[in-house]
């Protein structure tokens, strides 16, 4: 537990937005269902990558908020965490939000809810439970499975960019599919597009890829993916 407490102490610097009182600061001994504030610097990701297009969009949105607006926004987006071996908090959702806050230099902490405190488990036991709950996406930024959970980045700032995750977000924003509660739905769509849509490096690469991805998103091949939306001519009225 000393390692986490030491990091926490070093992170308590002035921030652009100071989260309001009413929540305790993160502590490795907090029980499940506790609400707290947690420094982004100590959060450990449960996925390797984010879509940087989405991160950049959210960072710009956050950058335009007043301190009061951002405070309300963060209270509406409470981050679920699981406390793992060594007392480290693992971020189970809102990884794009956490990365966007770093990008915007707008804040260094999130409101969080402890879903489970598994700090007493061994590493293998911890990851077995994480997999059982579907609380980790153990693939790299190209969609390939990780050989081991220890291959995950250790910090939010070190998460890598998966361009196809950005493409999946762009398609969802255009109603190519619906947002769902299904875990890691964006990555399922990213892998679907990865196998079917070319994403180049040019200035218009994402625009061109989005047009193509919108077509395949409505195809019969995609019907089993979370949030699938049938093409307009197939929707019964």
Model-assigned labels for residue ranges:
Residues 90-93:
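Short hydrophobic beta-strand that contains or immediately precedes a catalytic carboxylate
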Residues 24-72, 76-88, 102-237:
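Surface-exposed, charge/polar-rich loops and edge strands
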Residues 7-17:
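Bacterial N-terminal signal peptides
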Residues 1-5:
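Positively charged n-region of N-terminal signal peptides that target proteins for export
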């Amino acid at each position: 537990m000393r390692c986490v407490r030491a990091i926490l102490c070093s992170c308590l610097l002035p921030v652009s937005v100071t989260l309001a009182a009413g929540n305790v600061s993160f502590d490795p001994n907090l029980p499940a269902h506790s609400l707290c504030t947690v420094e982004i610097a100590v959060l450990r990701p449960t996925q390797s990558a984010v879509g940087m297009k989405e991160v950049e969009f959210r960072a710009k949105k956050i950058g335009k908020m007043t301190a009061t607006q951002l405070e309300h926004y963060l209270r509406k987006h409470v981050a679920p965490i699981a406390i793992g071996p060594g007392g480290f908090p693992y971020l189970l959702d809102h990884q794009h939000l956490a990365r966007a806050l770093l990008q915007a230099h707008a804040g260094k902490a999130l409101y969080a809810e402890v879903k489970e405190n598994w700090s007493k488990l061994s590493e293998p036991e911890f990851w077995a439970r994480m997999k059982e709950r579907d609380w980790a996406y153990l693939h790299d930024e190209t969609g390939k499975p990780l050989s081991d959970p220890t291959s995950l980045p250790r910090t939010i700032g070190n998460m890598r960019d998966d361009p196809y995750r950005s493409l999946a977000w762009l398609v969802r924003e255009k109603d190519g599919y619906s947002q769902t509660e299904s875990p890691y739905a964006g990555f399922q769509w990213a892998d679907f597009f990865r196998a079917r849509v070319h994403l180049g490096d040019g200035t218009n690469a994402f625009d061109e890829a989005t047009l193509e991805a919108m077509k395949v998103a409505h195809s019969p091949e995609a019907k089993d993916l979370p949030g699938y939306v049938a093409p307009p001519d197939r929707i019964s009225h």
